[in-house]
Amino acid sequence: MLGDGKEGTSTIPGFNQIQFEGFYRFIDQGLIEELSKFPKIEDIDHEIEFQLFVETYQLVEPLIKERDAVYESLTYSSELYVSAGLIWKTSRNMEEQRIFIGNIPLMNSLGTSIVNGIYRIVINQILQSPGIYYQSELDHNGISVYTGTIISDWGGRLELEIDKKARIWARVSRKQKISILVLSSAMGLNLREILENVCYPEIFLSFLTDKEKKKIGSKENAILEFYQQFSCVGGDPIFSESLCKELQKKFFHQRCELGRIGRRNINSRLNLNIPQNNIFLLPRDILAAADHLIGMKFGMGTLDDMNHLKNKRIRSVADLLQDQLGLALARLENVVKGTISGAIRHKLIPTPQNLVTSTPLTTTYESFFGLHPLSQVLDRTNPLTQIVHGRKLSYLGPGGLTGRTANFRIRDIHPSHYGRICPIDTSEGINVGLIGSLSIHARIGDWGSLESPFYELFEKSKKARIRMLFLSPSQDEYYMIAAGNSLALNRGIQEEQAVPARYRQEFLTIAWEEVHLRSIFPFQYFSIGASLIPFIEHNDANRALMSSNMQRQAVPLSRSEKCIVGTGLERQVALDSGVPAIAEHEGKILYTDTEKIVFSSNGDTLSIPLIMYQRSNKNTCMHQKPQVRRGKCIKKGQILADGAATVGGELALGKNILVAYMPWEGYNFEDAVLISECLVYGDIYTSFHIRKYEIQTHVTTQGPERITKEIPHLEGRLLRNLDKNGIVMLGSWVETGDILVGKLTPQVAKESSYAPEDRLLRAILGIQVSTSKETCLKLPIGGRGRVIDVRWVQKKGGSSYNPEIIRVYISQKREIKVGDKVAGRHGNKGIISKILPRQDMPYLQDGRPVDMVFNPLGVPSRMNVGQIFECSLGLAGSLLDRHYRIAPFDERYEQEASRKLVFSELYEASKQTANPWVFEPEYPGKSRIFDGRTGDPFEQPVIIGKPYILKLIHQVDDKIHGRSSGHYALVTQQPLRGRSKQGGQRVGEMEVWALEGFGVAHILQEMLTYKSDHIRARQEVLGTTIIGGTIPKPEDAPESFRLLVRELRSLALELNHFLVSEKNFQINRKEV
């Protein structure tokens, strides 16, 4: 909440609202809009007419529940029914039926869709808004060339440009351009109409040559000239109806369809009053655009800023789903046409039911959710990740930019982003600046623009209510907007005279009386990720960016803990993520256990199932723990059960632990982190991870594959965990190499491998003897753990195309270990370098050993000083048993407000606990601490405190890898690369130089031959290792050298080479 009751209030909107509003707009408007475009379909003889009656459409409630859809790998969707009629024109009879058109995937309470059992989310795209944009570029002579670009609704472009002789050209492609007179004539105007409708007719007349007059003498001539230039055809084309249709389809429909947004933009830019339903480009638009272009040439008018948000539009979930529905209905139209003509050809009587199939709609949506770049698998690492994913804005995707072609200006922060797109939160790497995040209060308007709320200020009495306005980027340019650092909501109570404000893309300092609007909230400019960083105003923006990305990578811990120092947004994030179970009605708890909570409400008994050990797609563990007791009365909205990484309905991603900023024997050099063994034995940073292993059974040409426990040639210990069906038992502890599912695949053996009696049977009776090969599901390296769930999914119609799938879920308990990555909330990340015994860790004056030692050199150069404030305030909070929620930019209250708050709390903590070392006036915030090994105090006082530290998903167990044996690439005969393929480490050019520098010739030779691509030497090494003996030295060239020779031969170059004998130094020439 913001403000008090008298002045008017503002609440933070729901974080999933963007997705919900988009889907609602699709169901409410887009669905009817697309269905109403479905044309009436007639047969060739015009005897039968098929049409849809849109008004009667119906979406049926899904037959299955969300949870079952995930469990059985199905799509959570609704069936769409529409009334259709078949009219026989000869007898004027009409047959009407309610037909099933297809399934439309629904959105659940998380703002996501479930497709084939997988949570998927559609992210919003930022595109150039359709309309006209004026720009200028310098040509090779340094003269400004003015252009006007008309962008259509489909992204097609038509450029108008004016040359130094003031002639205007329309550029239809990169190479071809035609006169604007020809284009206007081809669109149906004659010369008199053109000259009557422009402001500068004399300029149009000035470049009208005899040749031009001939071209625009008639509409047919103009169309032929235009077609010749547009299609780049040689010779003299002849005017025909088909040529007109082709031009209409290829040019006017694709490049000139503006849509309602484009029509609105062109009307406002060119001061036209053409009706909104006229969504195509008209000759009047072209002439008005040309007039504007001439004005630009003579210094009138302003150029457009292409990166301003008023020139962008948001393509939301609604638009993407509507486009797909249009595509599906176009496919359905073709199917209906084909079926009608087929029925007439075979003299069958069609009905609406058998004309329509549900395949086009269902497959279109399944392929959209599965393949479209803007439809992504929901990242469910922790509750914050789930929410942030749906609020992303992407410049990438169909019709947008690519990571390689986007320039720096597009990626940069623009003043119009203020309060709409977060200036901090973006991805790192090639997509930096192209994938952004919505600010907390931003919303998508009706015209696809991003809107931000502001308070309107009044001159009147203090009793007047404050009014809140949502402004689009084009509207807020005309207002003086104060930057939200003033406390008062009304002008009358303002103390400061001059305030920083924003006006027309500039940041100014103006008198308070001149302000029109003010920001409503300190968080207004930031995304959710950046808003969770306390003291963000004391951090460098690059580090804040890293922090907002790293909080999304935090692993939910087995015992979560609230942060002592937060920003106040933690509760809202947890509630909107849908992770905790929340009471929808008030009532009384009747029964609770780990699986469900039962309570009575208004005489009804309701049961709420809890999530138990569910796997997220990042292998983290989703689990709900009940927080209410039997017999307790609950209110609506109360927390019934906490989910992963939430405590008491608040986000809890990490732990508050005791940290010292000091160097320790070089073990925290370059961002390494030293930790105490208490964090391991106390299960402070222990997390559970659930991995999924699956196997499919197919029907092969030799017969079906079998799931069985009877697997020949395998040791009994590998099969010890299987039940009688050949599937691993629940609760088993499994190690690397154990069989999880026993499976045999039938195969026909070769003649030579038959036993004599089999050969006899085959010769006498012709019986085909088949053998089986084991294709069991084995537990890979690093997968050891406890089996917590086994699912046998059998799809309907068990054909070979729908194989049975067996999924085994294994839970791992992972303590923190050397190589794991930890991070604070200020971009201060590091890798665990050593785990020290608790007695060796530095300890405080009250005898407590610290839990973690960070390098103090990580603070000054990186300018993320917020961590020092958080660290000291966390210590005070832990001693006073207080939690702090601090909004950013608290310096607006007074100078040095953050420092004063921290010092006052430390002083109070030292007084209440009677520990003077907590706040020592000579070096406030620091304390003298002792070396655990010697008991001596360190030379200098050290900053100690309790910051909130997260354990990230980048864990050493997922990354560490070694190759003993594995596959080789077919062409180069070198080991494959990557952990997943059991690959090797590449010894590159620089590594070879390093080994040469050390003079380790034998090791280098091994790396370049035996261990890499010397085929014969590899086999000899295997032999000598088995029988014992000295390993022979390779004498000829390795395979990569032979490959080089072959590639040179393919270029007709022969490379001669010689082998020098090591014994007698004789040159021996060999053919490769």
From Swiss-Prot:
Cell membrane keyword on record: no
Gene Ontology biological process terms in this record: DNA-templated transcription
Molecular-function GO terms, alphabetical: DNA binding; DNA-directed RNA polymerase activity; ribonucleoside binding
Documented EC number(s): 2.7.7.6
Subcellular location per the Swiss-Prot or TrEMBL entry: Plastid, Chloroplast
InterPro entries, sorted: DNA-dir_RNA_pol_bsu_ext_1_sf (IPR042107), DNA-dir_RNA_pol_su2 (IPR015712), DNA-dir_RNAP_su2_dom (IPR007120), DNA-dir_RNAP_su2_hyb_sf (IPR037033), RNA_pol_bsu_bac (IPR010243), RNA_pol_bsu_CS (IPR007121), RNA_pol_Rpb2_2 (IPR007642), RNA_pol_Rpb2_2_sf (IPR037034)
Source domain of life: Eukaryota
Record key words, sorted: Chloroplast, DNA-directed RNA polymerase, Nucleotidyltransferase, Plastid, Transcription, Transferase
Pfam families the UniProt entry points to: RNA_pol_Rpb2_2, RNA_pol_Rpb2_3, RNA_pol_Rpb2_6, RNA_pol_Rpb2_7
Family: Belongs to the RNA polymerase beta chain family.
Subunit structure: In plastids the minimal PEP RNA polymerase catalytic core is composed of four subunits: alpha, beta, beta', and beta''. When a (nuclear-encoded) sigma factor is associated with the core the holoenzyme is formed, which can initiate transcription.
Function statement: DNA-dependent RNA polymerase catalyzes the transcription of DNA into RNA using the four ribonucleoside triphosphates as substrates.
NCBIfam families for the chain: PRK00405.1
Protein name listed in UniProt: DNA-directed RNA polymerase subunit beta
Organism of this sequence: Crucihimalaya wallichii (Rock-cress)
Organism phylogeny: Eukaryota, Viridiplantae, Streptophyta, Embryophyta, Tracheophyta
